[in-house]
Amino acid sequence: LQTRNAKMNAVAMIKTSVDMVNEKLIDKNRALARLHAEQLEQLLHRAIDSKSIKNYTMLVKGIAASPGAASGIAVLDVKRATIMGENGVKVILIREETKPEDVPAFFESVGILTSRGGKTSHAAVVARGMGKPCIVGCSDLRIDYENKQCSVDGKIVHEGDPITIDGSTGSVYLGEIPT
């Protein structure tokens, strides 16, 4: 007989720990010790509804730069994203990369997506500091600012189309997935 420690997300770890305490298999202190700081941090951010995700198409995968999930409309222009966000529209800002002058749009966006960059890029660092979901380094994402659209392998997202980003996994989905 072989045994291994189960790999599970924060919610599953808490549920199994509570069950084990209720069944008197472990005490409360041991249950708390089973949770790692990273797992507790997962609980502080929005997550995609795991039951709904199978009904949506993944567009692209990039580098998970800042945790959390967000749904909104795709916007490629910084000024337009700022104005729309100020008017209560949930916006996902999409850029090849970001620079300091783009920060006003960060405040008004629910999430950021870039085709370039890494975990220490401008978009990643600023988004983490603001607690906004962010995915960077989506190298397969082709951004066409002139036609206000982006694409991956023939799948086109026009500005105004709903998308969902999961900054915890680096996945981008077509449509608005419940979080």
Protein language model features and the residues they cover:
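Terminal amphipathic helices with adjacent charged low-complexity linkers/tails
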Residues: 1-58, 158-179
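Acidic, glycine-rich flexible loop/linker segments
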Residues: 47, 70, 74-80, 88-90, ...
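Translation machinery proteins
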Residues: 54-81
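Glycine-centered secondary-structure boundary/capping sites
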Residues: 62, 87-88
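Short, conserved, surface-exposed binding loops centered on an aromatic residue
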Residues: 84
